[in-house]
Amino acid sequence: MLLWASLLAFAPVCGQSAAAHKPVISVHPPWTTFFKGERVTLTCNGFQFYATEKTTWYHRHYWGEKLTLTPGNTLEVRESGLYRCQARGSPRSNPVRLLFSSDSLILQAPYSVFEGDTLVLRCHRRRKEKLTAVKYTWNGNILSISNKSWDLLIPQASSNNNGNYRCIGYGDENDVFRSNFKIIKIQELFPHPELKATDSQPTEGNSVNLSCETQLPPERSDTPLHFNFFRDGEVILSDWSTYPELQLPTVWRENSGSYWCGAETVRGNIHKHSPSLQIHVQRIPVSGVLLETQPSGGQAVEGEMLVLVCSVAEGTGDTTFSWHREDMQESLGRKTQRSLRAELELPAIRQSHAGGYYCTADNSYGPVQSMVLNVTVRETPGNRDGLVAAGATGGLLSALLLAVALLFHCWRRRKSGVGFLGDETRLPPAPGPGESSHSICPAQVELQSLYVDVHPKKGDLVYSEIQTTQLGEEEEANTSRTLLEDKDVSVVYSEVKTQHPDNSAGKISSKDEES
């Protein structure tokens, strides 16, 4: 129902304060025309009376003005003229004109009739002499003729009922009696309200108070009214309420438009609305765009998160933040929100992410760019050593597996040679003259690390050496001889290349070389 969250402000019906209200005279019986000799009671209303207070009455006739002081707030009168009353400290009331007539037929009407009231007109004959029929005219036109009721009732009176009224009475012997003319003017219950705003050109993010002001007449100051508020003729800002004020806690540029309010009686028979009021919400352009990082200073750690923070010093409304890298045309990210700052997270930063970054902010006046911030990426301590250690370990394990496979192969061949002695083709060739009768399989295998660089650069190698020695029958018994002293030594080199952190493929290459 509401475009944004609105709060109703509690306030009395707009108008004058109670101290400035005029007193109001009420008449009993409630007419303004009487026959001579009749008595009428006037009451001065509109303020609180105390026993010791008195009321001043003013009576103006053709001979002048007469003052009467009464101990209470009532006065009994029998003379024609204008009557006013005044209490201590109050202004004079509006005048009430009374007419005491000597005619045989009078038209009686109430002192005041307001729009929405029922207008009652009474055709009255002196001394209660009977009438057989009554005719009412309005501006010379016959309004009604009745032989049952001498009163005329006009419900829901309005200004359309203003005019000159008269009644004509008919007696038993076809006598005709004509009353005085009575001009009736229906009074306005309240004027069209006026919508007021604390600021018709507010800045975005501020509040605006709206008030729907109208004024009830003193005679009807106790009439309850309901109020509501609209925008652009359709958007309802509030339901009907007895409070004539509305607070808009926060306004934005889209809240600009034509505002108006309505006031009506509780019964809803009188409804009026105010002229429109244009409200233009002002937007402050963004300025002071700044790009920062978390961690601060543009110092990022490889593998960890980097947060790019884009902020503005000023600017209201929806702001679109966009992050960019100098060597890229496309935006890294974009966010639109009502705030002075926004964040973009880069989950795992890498060396390739180093470079110049900047951001822009735009709240419909065009993008404003920040200064370029240089982001550097440093390696995580221990990251390179870990890669080297892993590469070296992998190389050694590969060499060890190769040695085990070679021993197993020789064992299988030796076992096969025993079981097939009759097969000449499967026996090894006989040794030549002067040659020792050696086994073709090594008797001992030694794995030795030749070189490990704990701080390799890109392309560094890790070498491992596998030495195999073939022993004769005599030499097998002599275990004190070193492997490197044997002339028949087989050396296997294993080359392990380690990966530099920039190698995104994450591969470690290796190459075996036998000599």
From Swiss-Prot:
Glycans are attached at N374. Specifically expressed by memory and monocytoid B-cells which populate spleen and lymph nodes. Preferentially expressed in memory B-cells associated with mucosal tissue (at protein level). Residues 1-19 form the signal peptide. The gene is FCRL4. It comes from Homo sapiens (Human). It holds the Pfam family Ig_2. InterPro entries: Ig-like_dom, Ig-like_dom_sf, Ig-like_fold, Ig_Fc_receptor, Ig_sub, Ig_sub2, Immunoglobulin_dom. This is Fc receptor-like protein 4. It is a single-pass type I membrane protein. Disulfide bonds join C44-C85, C123-C167, C212-C261, C310-C359. The chain crosses the membrane at residues 388-408. Residues 20-387 are extracellular. One of its GO terms (molecular function) is transmembrane signaling receptor activity. Interacts with PTPN6 and PTPN11. One of its GO terms (biological process) is immune response. The record marks S17, A18 as: Breakpoint for insertion to form FCRL4-IGHA1 fusion protein. Residues 494-515 are annotated as: Disordered. A motif (ITIM motif 1) lies at residues 449-454.
